[in-house]
From Swiss-Prot:
Gene name for this UniProt entry: groES
Protein name as it appears in the record: Co-chaperonin GroES
Gene Ontology CC terms: cytoplasm
GO MF, one example: metal ion binding
Species this chain originates from: Proteus mirabilis (strain HI4320)
Summary of subunit composition and partner proteins: Heptamer of 7 subunits arranged in a ring. Interacts with the chaperonin GroEL.
SUPFAM superfamilies: GroES-like (SSF50129)
Known role: Together with the chaperonin GroEL, plays an essential role in assisting protein folding. The GroEL-GroES system forms a nano-cage that allows encapsulation of the non-native substrate proteins and provides a physical environment optimized to promote and accelerate protein folding. GroES binds to the apical surface of the GroEL ring, thereby capping the opening of the GroEL channel.
Bilayer-crossing regions: none
Domain of life, source organism: Bacteria
Length: 97
């Protein structure tokens, strides 16, 4: 996939969530709900500050993140793959191993 986000935007591939019901049945897909975790596929150059300087992003390609799946998150299909385009500010945390 060749895509380069601009400024403070990132491209995220949502990670599938596996959930279990109270009875122990594994729920997948829409029954499990949408995951708010994903892997960073691409990052922009950084946030342009008021003084014109560019502040590099805190996330990098390959990071697993927890994000806010809100109004500013755009869903796109690129090369038959569902991805999310969001600002770095929509990312709440980086999951560290």
């Amino acid at each position: 996939m060749k895509i380069r986000p601009l400024h403070d935007r990132v491209i995220v591939k949502r990670k599938e969530v596996e959930a279990k019901s109270a009875g122990g049945i594994v729920l997948t897909g829409s029954a499990a709900g949408k995951s708010t975790r994903g892997e960073i596929l691409a990052v922009g150059n950084g946030r342009i500050m008021e003084n014109g300087e560019v502040k590099p992003l805190d996330v990098k390609v390959g990071d697993i993140v927890i994000f806010n799946d809100g109004y500013g998150v755009k869903s796109e299909k690129i090369d038959n793959e569902d991805v999310l385009i969001m600002s770095e500010s929509d990312i709440l945390a980086i999951v560290e191993a």
